[in-house]
Amino acid sequence: MGKNCSTDRKKELGIVFRYLMYFTLAVMAAGNLSFDVMANPGRDAVSILQQNCVGCHGGFEVNGDLDLTSLRNSRHLRKDPELLVQLMNAVSDKTMPPEGESVLEESVRQELLHSLGEVLRQVEFESAVMSDGVARLNRFQYNNTIKDLFELKIDVFALPEKLMTRHEPYLTGGNGVMPERVRVESLALRPQAGMTNVKSFPKDSRASHGFDNQVDVLTMSPLLLDAFLRLAVSIVESPDFTAEKVGVWDELFSEKSENTTLEEEIRKRLAVFLYRAFRRPIEDDTLTRYTNYALSHTSRGLDLTESMKKAVSAVLSSPRFFYRSRSATSGELSFEIASSLSYTLWGSCPDGELLKVAANGELSDPQVLRSTIRRMLKDPKVERFMDSFPVQWMQLEALMAVTPDPGVNRYFSLDAQYPATVQMVLEPLLLFDGVFVENRSIDELISPVFSYHSPFLKSWYGEKLSPPSVDEQAINQENDLRSKAIASEQAIVDDYNKQLQEVDTAIKNPVISGLVEADLVAGQLKWEDSQAKQSKGELELSPWSKIGPFRANSLDDAHKTAFVDEAAVDLEKQYGDLRWEKADDLVDGKIHELREGNSAHYVYRTIRTEAARSVQISLGSDDSFKLWHNGVLIGQKNMVRGVAPDQDKFRLELAAGENEILFKISNGVGGYAFYFQASAIALPDPVTAALKIERGNRDDNQRKVLSDYYLAIAPELQEARRILNLKKDELIREREVVQNKLNSLPKPKSVAAHRDDAQRGFDNHVRNQLRVREFDRVAIEDPRYGGIITNAAMLSMTSGPKRTHPVARGVWITEVIFNDPPSPPPNDIPPLNEEDGPKDLTIREKFAAHRENPSCAGCHSKLDPLGFALENYDITGRWRERYMNGREVDVTGTLMRTHVFADVLEFKASLTSESDRFSRAFVSHLLRFAVMRELTPQDEIIIDTIMDRTREDRHLMRAVIEEVLYQSVQ
């Protein structure tokens, strides 16, 4: 083939088993070639290989450790079927001859493929598809088997590997049409809890490029065996293992019937359970052993229910339960077929009907086998197949660990509990559901006409994904209006403040303010003389007199209504049925209870003093109160409150002689009370010191101290101050109205604040979208999106935190779409250093030098066109035309050295033109899932058969699944 062949045989030949016979069959059907294969199968293949390939794979130069010089006839090829398949794949995939060498003419390539295929069909394989061996139940299968055996209404343990939870039975409950709207969600990051006190064994490993049900990875270590044994006991001992949650409780665990002996009852129950648990007929000695085990517990005093639990946990601890044998012996083959079908489609043990046809040996009848598979596809338990195969085939579990750099896209992980992954993962799974339910061609997984989108996905694909812009001009205009309104009201408040300052000044000295004419000198002299007498006498407080309750319509009514002569109290006067009464029990300094709702009480007393003096009155009330001194209202509050001491305090200037105190307490709903305490106010020390000095001997400062103090307490100014305080209260109330209006006015808000509000609102909008469960069916109007390749799930999980990974995307396509996984890179090849080189290089340009390494070129020539074709999608699957450095995205390439494309639409069209390759790859994946092992050259013939039988209808999903299941148990 030339001198530049790769030195890695596996890379050159594309190690996988796929894509081979379609080309041969197509050519034969077209009648374009004439082959004499019956006379000498493989003769043409040997001839073509010798003419075109020995140059690189023979003589002094043996590239890829493949020497074809000894190849003389087809017998050499039949001896090495794996090499035979590798040659077919390399030629079919056009990886051979390598780039830079002469390309085989299409007719020659087709002739070579056909001849190699005929040789493969003549290989005498030793084993059947259902090979001998055992397979342990994986977590998913174990959970489902336990649920079905006991008809449990909850999962045994949490299953984060279940990526989609369907809230409607649309898979089998409709008429072959998916609903326009479905309710689904992904609970993978917050899985529903299983049974209490039940701990699962660790999550199962994935086979390389495979599934979690593969025999070679489902091993059993001593630690894992111990976990299985503990699990079996914990299930039946769980508080959730009750008659309410176990559907077979009555048949398996209830107390025995009166018509049988205890041994007969246990034996009867265990016979049914063992048959289903072991999934095959049970020997008498096995049944007897478990029966005796249960009886041993009843003989120790346990009741039948607990004894059956012990026996059942022993059954679940048996390898015959948690292992699936793969025996090809005729006696149990039907039951192995039943288990294979059941665990493939239902992820669980066979049901009664499946065991029945197995016991009757009917599964060997092709018609019965096919009808059985079709029945199983219609059973609701097929949802478990949809929960396992599509997820693992598309490698979607990798998506759940994706965490893009918030600096690149902040919305992906905006909600830690509901990241974008829980929405994205549902799109490809719903597409698979739709193709299955509507039995569409599997080609539509690549190029569908519909998809299912949530509001979040609609925004993700179609919108700018940013908050709405703000109108700076409108904001500034609005701020001007707001500022003017605030300034207007603030001017009024300022005017009130000015008036209040003037009133406060007048209250301090009403004489200077001109509000009253009074000779304070005479009053001060009289007051000074009285202070000498004050020290010789104490306050004389009369007992309280009380009248009430006076009923009213409301608290406000009770507070405002004058039920007695409040300015001139007459203790002899009667008011209706009420009269003043002595109340010797009302002691100062205590809270006194009153009765009646919506009413008022009055209490009255006198305070006698030989000289004018100051006292402090401390009040408490439930609810409102008014206080009069010598007929003058000196304080009031109209409110609802509970009583407490010292809620309000007043300074009272008592005149020499007798002073009258009237206290009104008003109540709303319920009981009420009051508190009263009077105490003399000591003179300030400077005043006391000045009074001790003879009047003629006082200095200016002492005279000022006394005049200032008297000015503050002068009885001559009391009325003026009362009026001024009323005016002050009115001004305060009026100012409060304006201030409240001012406070309620919207404040100017900066443009930056508006942007922040818009961002917060948009963030909340996105958070709400991330929690939506409803997905709507939408037509694919934008051909850039749709299908299992160009969706946010696949594109996100094949990217890094900060940039896309074209190679990872290429690997995903070769593995998932073409079932052609590349060889791992050589150990001596360093990874790409993204920090090297100029910052303005594109990722394609950075990879250019990497691809120049001969050890890398082979794989990269296949992977790079696939990965770079998707570079218009950023790390989260959103469309972009340029990189962050401003450079345009270049997606041009060639698919399989045949299909040249300039954009992603042409790339997708190229994939569609290779639909038969995809179909064959899909069948290969599904067959591997069904047989639970890596495929062999023999399986290539099985795949040919499946492809042939489903090709006419374009490989309809249900037909493909049926045929794969049918062939997998032959």
Describe the function of each predicted region.
Residues 626-628:
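Beta-strand signatures of extracellular beta-sandwich domains
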Residues 587-591, 602-603, 645-649:
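Short structured motifs
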Residues 1-17:
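N-terminal secretory signal peptides that target proteins for export/translocation
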Residues 40-66, 79-86, 90-95, 99, ...:
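Low-complexity, glycine/serine/threonine/alanine-rich intrinsically disordered linker
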Residues 19-32:
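Bacterial N-terminal signal peptides
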Residues 597-607:
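Short beta-strands within extracellular/lumenal beta-sheet-rich domains
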Residues 637-638:
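Short hydrophobic alpha-helix segments
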Residues 29, 35-41:
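Boundary at the C-terminal end of the N-terminal hydrophobic targeting segment
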